Curated annotation (Swiss-Prot):
Family stated for the protein in its record: Belongs to the SLAIN motif-containing family.
InterPro entries: Slain
Gene responsible for this protein: slain1
Biased composition (Low complexity): 268-286, 466-481
Any single GO CC term annotated in Swiss-Prot or TrEMBL for this entry: cytoplasm
Entry-linked PANTHER family: NASCENT POLYPEPTIDE-ASSOCIATED COMPLEX SUBUNIT ALPHA, MUSCLE-SPECIFIC FORM (PTHR22406), SLAIN MOTIF-CONTAINING PROTEIN 1 (PTHR22406:SF2)
Major localization listed first in the record, in broad terms: cytoplasm
Top-level division of the source organism's lineage: Eukaryota
Cellular compartments annotated: Cytoplasm, Cytoskeleton
Protein name as catalogued: SLAIN motif-containing protein 1
UniProt xrefs under Pfam families: SLAIN
Disulfide bridge partners, by residue number: none
Length: 545
């Protein structure tokens, strides 16, 4: 600002010049003040506009250069934009872009929410007189109208529809005929396969054959038992023949193992299950034959199978070398049963029921008697080496007698024909008595004998008063009730070498050496009360429990 120098006006010419200059200076100062006032007013209006509207960053858009550099445009200067010469606002200011058409459609209060309807701000430019405000955007236009729209159909996907997919450069382009139906196309591929498909088919067939080979080799559970045979057959023969031979070998091995398991099961379970099977106890007392032959194939037969053999047809030739059934059953069973099994005396109730069971059996046939005679002839060649001096007419067998018969029988039969396994299938006398005792408490009609034509042994007879000795026959005639025993009993001592009696067709028996045999009949007379009381008081006193 120019300094105003006041001086005395004495009328001199210098004084008049100074007054004129002062007036000019005052005018300049007045104009400057007006400019400052206008500038302050604009600043106040601008500040109020900024305080009323705080736009979001997406509104800070830049106008096209043609609009920015027009004379009728009023903007808030920004460091980014180049300010034209006609703009009057200083820098720095906020980066809000606005024009004189703020009240219009550029920043519409309804859409932006910046201004209220009663407080619309009209920004005027300093150079308003130089050009009208027609340079501003047309009312009704928005910023979205200036956005360039991209045409997706033009330039991007206007070509082939498959061009945007990735195509390997090594893959050959095969043209697909759209006129061919999918079924025809599939048939074309199957009828004319490519080398890759042929190789895959061969590989699949090979793998399937390998899987079948492995599966069939492990089908038989017993293939590991005879592995050396199966492997040698597979090595020698082809694959298909190996399967057949292996299956045949497995069948044979399975048959042998089943046969062996049946023998072992019968040997282990016959004595255990005989307690609950009353019918087995009568097969011995009724004179049925028990399987105890010296040949090896008799081991696989049970007691019931022997009964069936001897009920319908005579015994085969290898079984003729059998001793008396009762003697053999008692002597064999003594090898594995202890004396403790024969302690308690059973009641007379089971004797009556047992006799009624025995009476229902029929007498033997002539054919069976002849076979029995042949067996007794063969039995005569085996002397009783365990013979000891006869004791008194005591019906109770002593402990020494039974033990001697045990040792003799086990040594004789164990070393001669090895039927130790079959001995376990014959129940002991203690178990027989126990079973008879358990059956005696049931009604007679509960379980009749299975075989009507039961074979009655002619040698299972003898009075209750026959003197007992250490021989095998002493056990058989020691007072156990027999089905065809008569009421009369002779008490005559035995000879040194006792022999089984030979029975004839008419029922008469040839007496053994120095032993008077009682008369036998095929009809079974009922027991008298005297014989029953003798048995109960004498021999059955030390019965089994």
């Amino acid at each position: 600002m120019a300094e105003v120098k006041c001086s005395s006006s004495t009328g001199s010419p210098t004084t008049n010049g100074l007054v004129a200059n002062a007036e000019l200076e005052v005018k300049k100062l007045q104009e400057l003040v007006r400019k400052l006032e206008k500038q302050n007013e604009q600043l106040r209006n601008r500040a109020s506009a900024v305080s009323n509207c705080t736009p979001s960053p997406h509104l800070l858009l830049q106008h096209p250069p043609s609009v920015v550099h027009q004379s009728g445009t009023c903007i808030l200067s920004s460091p980014v934009l180049t300010r034209p010469a006609g703009l009057c606002l200083p820098s720095p200011v906020p980066t809000l872009l606005c024009t004189s058409a703020v009240a219009g459609s550029l920043f519409s209060p309804e859409s932006m929410g910046c201004f209220s309807t009663n407080k619309r701000l009209h920004l005027s430019c300093i150079n308003a007189a130089e050009g009208p405000q027609n340079d501003c955007p047309v009312p009704g236009s928005t910023l979205l109208d200036e956005v360039q729209v991209l045409d997706l159909e033009d330039g991007y996907c206007s070509g082939d529809e498959d061009t945007w997919l990735y195509v390997s450069p090594t893959k050959d382009q095969r043209t697909f005929d759209s006129s061919v139906s999918p079924l025809q196309w599939c048939r074309q591929v199957l009828d004319h396969p490519s080398p890759e498909i042929e190789a895959a088919k061969r590989s699949l067939c090979f793998r399937l054959e390998q899987g079948y080979t492995v599966k069939t080799s492990h089908l038989s559970p017993q293939s590991s038992v005879d592995s050396e045979l199966s492997t040698s057959e597979l090595e020698d023969d082809s694959i298909s023949m190996g399967y057949k031979l292996q299956d045949l070998t497995d069948v044979q091995i399975m048959a042998r193992l089943q046969e062996e398991s049946l023998r072992q099961d019968f040997a282990t379970t016959s004595t255990c299950s005989s307690v609950s099977r009353p019918r087995s106890s009568f097969s011995l007392y009724s004179g049925k034959k028990l399987s105890c032959s010296s040949d090896q194939d008799s081991d696989r037969y049970s007691v019931e199978e022997d009964d069936e053999d001897f009920d319908h047809l005579p015994p085969p030739q290898p079984r003729l070398s059998r001793c008396s059934p009762l003697q053999r059953g008692l002597s064999h069973s003594q090898t594995f049963s202890s004396i403790r099994d024969c302690r308690k005396s059973p009641s007379s109730q089971f004797l009556n029921g047992y006799q009624q069971y025995n009476y229902s059996s029929q007498p033997q046939t002539t054919e069976q008697s002849q076979s029995r005679t042949n067996a007794d002839k063969l039995r005569r060649s085996m002397p009783n080496l365990a013979r000891m001096p006869s004791t008194n007419n005591n019906p109770v067998v002593s402990m020494t007698t039974v033990r001697n018969s045990q040792s003799f029988d086990s040594n004789l039969h164990g070393a001669a024909n090895g039927v130790s396994r079959m001995q376990s299938s014959i129940p002991s006398p203690g178990q027989l008595q126990q079973r008879v005792h358990s059956v005696g408490h049931f009604p007679v009609s509960v379980r009749p004998p299975l075989k009507a034509t039961a074979y009655v042994s002619p040698t299972v007879q003898g009075g209750s008063g026959i003197p007992s000795s250490t021989s095998l026959q002493s056990l058989s005639s020691s007072g156990i009730p027999m089905p065809n025993k008569t009421t009369s009993a002779a008490t005559i001592g035995r000879s040194a070498l006792p022999r089984p009696a030979l029975s004839t067709a008419n029922g008469s028996s040839i007496p053994r050496s120095k032993i008077a045999q009682p008369q036998r009949s095929f009809l079974q007379p009922p027991k008298t009360l005297a014989s029953l009381s003798t048995l109960r008081d004498g021999n059955w006193r030390d019965g089994c429990y």
